[in-house]
C-alpha cells in the first residue's frame, strides 16, 4: 500500500495542539533552538533530548532510524536505531570471516567448524554480509548488518560465544544474544544451555535486565557504542551511537545507551563492541546496495571479528509494488520546506522501476502533487499547507 509520509500533510488533518515539533535539517541545532520535551521520545532517562528523528524502511519488518539528540551537557549525539520484527519475513544470523564463502553448503561449513579449520581473522561487516550472499544455500538477502562482540585485535578471535547455523565455534565468560530453533530471540548469561541455540554472539556487559537499567554502569566515558536489545513483544532492537566526532557526535556513556534502550522498550539488552568498530550498514527500501549508514570514528569501516546479519526471507522479484517515500514519519519545524523523494520497491522492499507518473496517477487516485511543504505555527496549533508529494493510504 502507498502511505503518505505524514498523516496531516496536504491538509488531510491537522496535528493535535500539543504535537511535538522537530526539524529535519540541519543535523546540528542552534544553541537557542526550541527542542521537543524529552519525555515524548525515547532516551529521556539519562537527560537525552531528541532534536530530529528520520526513519527509513529497509524491508518487511525492518526499519532504521537516525536519531539526533542533545545530552545533558548540551553536546550533540547521533544514533541509529534498528527495529526488527521477527514475526515478519526476517531473521538474524551470526557471521564470522571465512565461515560463509563462495559456493559453500551448510554441510561444508559444519565440517569446517567440527574439524577446527575455521581460522581466526578479521574483515569488515559489509564484507561478511556479502560473503553470506555468495554461499550456495543461504536463505534470503542481507538487508542490515552490524558488528558484534569484543575481540582480540591481533588474532580476530571473539571474546565470547559464537554459534552459527547451530555450530558452536566458541564459548566464553560473557552474556550472549541468541536466535533459538523456534526463531525467537533471547539474551542469556554465560554458562547457559545452548542446545536450542541456532545463532549467537556475545557482548561484554548487560545493559538492561528485567526491564531495568543494570546498576553501576559507567556514566562518564562517552564514545561510539553499539548494543542489541529485545522488547517484551519479542522484537529486536539494535542501537549504535556515533562518537569521538564533536561537534557532530560526542558519543554516549554506557548508562546513556542503557537508558535509551530501556525507553525504547527493551526488557533485556547487552553491550556490543564500540569505538571504531561500531558499524551500521543497511540497504534501504527501493535500493539494492548495502551501505554503511553511520559515521565510523576511524573515518572508514573497520575490520572486525563477528557480526549480526539481518536477513529478509521475503521474495525479491523486482516488480513494482509500491513507492518508498522519504523522509517518512517526521514532524517539522514551523516554516520548514521539505522535499519528498520516491523510489520504486517490490513487495519485499527491493529495487523496482517506478511506473510513469501518468500511469501511477491513473492507478492511484489518492496520489497528489502539490506545492512545496510549508508548516506555519500560530499560537494554538501547527498547520500543514501542502507538500511536494503526498500519498494517502491506499487500501
Model-based region annotation:
Residues 155-172, 179, 213-267, 277-322, ...:
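Conserved, well-ordered active-site substructure
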Residues 64, 68-72, 77-83, 202-233:
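Conserved beta-alpha junction segments in alpha/beta enzyme cores
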Residues 336-350:
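Beta-strand-rich structural segments
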Residues 5-171, 186:
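Zymogen propeptides
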Residues 361-383:
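Low-complexity "stalk/linker" and mucin-like segments enriched in Ser/Thr/Pro/Ala/Gly
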Residues 330-336:
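Short, solvent-exposed loop/linker segments at the N-terminal edge
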Residues 53, 146-219:
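Active-site-adjacent helix-turn-beta-strand microarchitecture at beta-sheet edges
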Residues 379-395:
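A short beta-strand micro-motif common to beta-rich folds, especially ectodomain repeats
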Amino acid at each position: 500500500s502507498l502511505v503518505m509520509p505524514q498523516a496531516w500533510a496536504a491538509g488531510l488533518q491537522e496535528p493535535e495542539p500539543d504535537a511535538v515539533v522537530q526539524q529535519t535539517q540541519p543535523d546540528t541545532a542552534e544553541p537557542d533552538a526550541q527542542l521537543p520535551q524529552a519525555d515524548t521520545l525515547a532516551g529521556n532517562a539519562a537527560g537525552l533530548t531528541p532534536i530530529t528523528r528520520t526513519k527509513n524502511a529497509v524491508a518487511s519488518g525492518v526499519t532504521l532510524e537516525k536519531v539526533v539528540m542533545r545530552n545533558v551537557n548540551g553536546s550533540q549525539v547521533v544514533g541509529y536505531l534498528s527495529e526488527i520484527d521477527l514475526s515478519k519475513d526476517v531473521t538474524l544470523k551470526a557471521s564470522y570471516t571465512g565461515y560463509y564463502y563462495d559456493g559453500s553448503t551448510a554441510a561444508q561449513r559444519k565440517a569446517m567448524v567440527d574439524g577446527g579449520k575455521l581460522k581466526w581473522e578479521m574483515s569488515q561487516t559489509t564484507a561478511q554480509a556479502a560473503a553470506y550472499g555468495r554461499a550456495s544455500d543461504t536463505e534470503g538477502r542481507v538487508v542490515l548488518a552490524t558488528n558484534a562482540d569484543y575481540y582480540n585485535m591481533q588474532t580476530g578471535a571473539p571474546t565470547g560465544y559464537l554459534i552459527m547455523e547451530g555450530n558452536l565455534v566458541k564459548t566464553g565468560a560473557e552474556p550472549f544474544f541468541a536466535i533459538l530453533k523456534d526463531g525467537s530471540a533471547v539474551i542469556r548469561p554465560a554458562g547457559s544451555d545452548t542446545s536450542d541455540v541456532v545463532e549467537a554472539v556475545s557482548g561484554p556487559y548487560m545493559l538492561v535486565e528485567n526491564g531495568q537499567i543494570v546498576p553501576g554502569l559507567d556514566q562518564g566515558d562517552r564514545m561510539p557504542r553499539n548494543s542489541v536489545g529485545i522488547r517484551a513483544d519479542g522484537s529486536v532492537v539494535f542501537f549504535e551511537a556515533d562518537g569521538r566526532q564533536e561537534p557532530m557526535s560526542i558519543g554516549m556513556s554506557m548508562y546513556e545507551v542503557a537508558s535509551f534502550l530501556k525507553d525504547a522498550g527493551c526488557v533485556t539488552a547487552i553491550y556490543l563492541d564500540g569505538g571504531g568498530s561500531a558499524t551500521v550498514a543497511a540497504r534501504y527500501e527501493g535500493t539494492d546496495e548495502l551501505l554503511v549508514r553511520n559515521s565510523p570514528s576511524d573515518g572508514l569501516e573497520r575490520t572486525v571479528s563477528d557480526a549480526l546479519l539481518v536477513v529478509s526471507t521475503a521474495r525479491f522479484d523486482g516488480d513494482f509494488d509500491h513507492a518508498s517515500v522519504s523522509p517518512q514519519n517526521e514532524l517539522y519545524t514551523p516554516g520548514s520546506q521539505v522535499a519528498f523523494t520516491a523510489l520504486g520497491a517490490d513487495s519485499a522492499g527491493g529495487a523496482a522501476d517506478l511506473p510513469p507518473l501518468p500511469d501511477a496517477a491513473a492507478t492511484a487516485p489518492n496520489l497528489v502533487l502539490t506545492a512545496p511543504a510549508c508548516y506555519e505555527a500560530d499560537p494554538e496549533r501547527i498547520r500543514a499547507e501542502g507538500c511536494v508529494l503526498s500519498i494517502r493510504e491506499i487500501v
